[in-house]
Amino acid sequence: MRDNNNNNTREEERSSSSKQQQPQAPMSLKIIDSCLRLSVVPLSVATIWLTVTNHESNPDYGNLEYNSIMGLKYMVGVSAISAIYALLSTVSSWVTCLVSKAWLFFIPDQVLAYVMTTSVAGATEIVYLLNKGDKIVTWSEMCSSYPHYCSKLTIALGLHVFVLFFFLFLSVISAYRAFSPFDPPCDSQTNNDA
């Protein structure tokens, strides 16, 4: 009987202390979440603009544009999707009826984090091949012939990497929001006492 009273008292203390801390943590978390989402928009737009407007002519080799490389088209598409999603999710995160639906943010955040990872990997490979080439498959480096194109593409890739990191943080935040209402698993000693 005494153990039950102690357990009830401990549970009441935990619930009262967590109730006191809850209003503070979600609001600061919500502000961080919104700032990260809003930061994605200009970075993605800048990535798109730098990539799409990037072109350079060389009298020996001709024109080099973003649409001649399939991986850059993919990067532009992913950047556009991430900017639109970030804007819509920022607005909807302040709508009261959607805030309680943590899964509405968790699943797309996870998917976009993975898609951004593939996009960054593909764009990194392109920038690497443009800078270093691949002699085994007879792909020569092109940055000596197109220096402006390569430097602009490197900046776009850097911005795209920042967006990836923001989405990785957002996926952690949305996972915390989705799973925090659930109690942690009980240890075996607690189960034996019950």
Swiss-Prot record:
Residues 52-74, 134-152 are extracellular. InterPro entries: CASP/CASPL (IPR006459), CASP_dom (IPR006702). Disulfide bonds: none annotated. Residues 1-26 are annotated as: Disordered. The keyword Transmembrane applies. The chain crosses the membrane at residues 31-51, 75-95, 111-133, 153-173. Its main location: membrane. Residues 1-30, 96-110, 174-194 are cytoplasmic. Keywords: Cell membrane, Membrane, Transmembrane, Transmembrane helix. Residues 1-16 have a biased composition (Basic and acidic residues). It comes from the Eukaryota. Signal peptide: none annotated. It is a multi-pass membrane protein. GO terms for cellular component: plasma membrane. It is found in: Cell membrane. Homodimer and heterodimers. PANTHER family: CASP-LIKE PROTEIN 2C1-RELATED, CASP-LIKE PROTEIN 4A4. Belongs to the Casparian strip membrane proteins (CASP) family. This is CASP-like protein 2D1. It comes from Arabidopsis thaliana. The lineage of its organism: Eukaryota, Viridiplantae, Streptophyta, Embryophyta, Tracheophyta.
